[in-house]
Amino acid sequence: YLFYYFKPKLEFDFKSLFSEISKKEMYRFSLFAFAGSLGSVFAFRIDSLMIPKFISMEANGAFSIGVTLASALAVPATGIFILYAPIISNFIKNNQISELDLKYKEISKLLFFIGALLYSCIFLGIDNLFMLLPTHESLTGSIPVILILGFNVLINMATGFNGEIITYSKYYKFNLIAIGLLIILNVSLNLLFIKVLNYGIEGVAVASLISMIVFNLSKLLFIYKKFKILPFDISYLKLILVFATVLLISYYLPILDNHLLNLIYKTIFCLSLNLMVIYKLKLVFSYNFWVEKMIQKLQF
């Protein structure tokens, strides 16, 4: 159908690409973007190089389990970042800072909402889930790593699209500086926790968490300095308080003898209570919009 109505043809005229910016500026941006991407890959893979070197291959296997499960938390964020990338770029291009501020806060709360729901399930259910598996003895040691790295991902989601704001602005070079800071800090803390304090893979996970907090904090402060916007407001603080309270209540619920029942009832209780309270308080605009839309459809 597409080939029939839209005849494909090759064009080698790239003049339209440089109608608004010069080739030099385009090449400079591409170089910094490539260097930043390469630096990010190295920064987030440095642990898998240092653990076999300073601890053991077995420890690296346990750490990799934690990385894989924690990374699953970030899947929704990846899709949302891709979806909103052109919107962010357009706001910055047209200097619509007030609109950018509103979207920044809205998406940050949405990402934290999704991430906190998933992290709560992992926090409450990971131990019982592993106890149901025949290999639970070999998996138990990775639970602290999973929880720390999961919180690491949650912190990254909670700060919203701060990296995208910097990337699509004239301050895109700062991303490379921030990634350089992340690499130096991560390597230094890994050496401290592994070689000096002998904390093993838990120490590596803590090092990653501290590095990620500093990394995101540096970007938040930079964005505030240049644009005078932050992803946090009063409703965001209420959202954090709701999740923390519900998680605490769920954690101290009576423990059942059956691991499967314990896994199901604690996670369902936590999810249900969070969803109801957050809907009633109208803390996440997108969530309330989706729920009300579903209710309207069911009424018809």
Region locations from a protein language model:
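Interfacial/gating helices of multi-pass transporter permease domains
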Residues: E25-F29, A33, I51-S71, E99, ...
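Interhelical loop/hinge segments that connect adjacent transmembrane helices in multipass membrane
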Residues: Y1-F44, I87, I92-L102, K226-I240, ...
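Membrane-interface junctions at transmembrane-helix termini in multi-pass inner-membrane proteins
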Residues: L147-L181, I223-K225
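Helix-loop junctions and terminal segments of transmembrane helices
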Residues: G66, A70-S108, N162-Y168
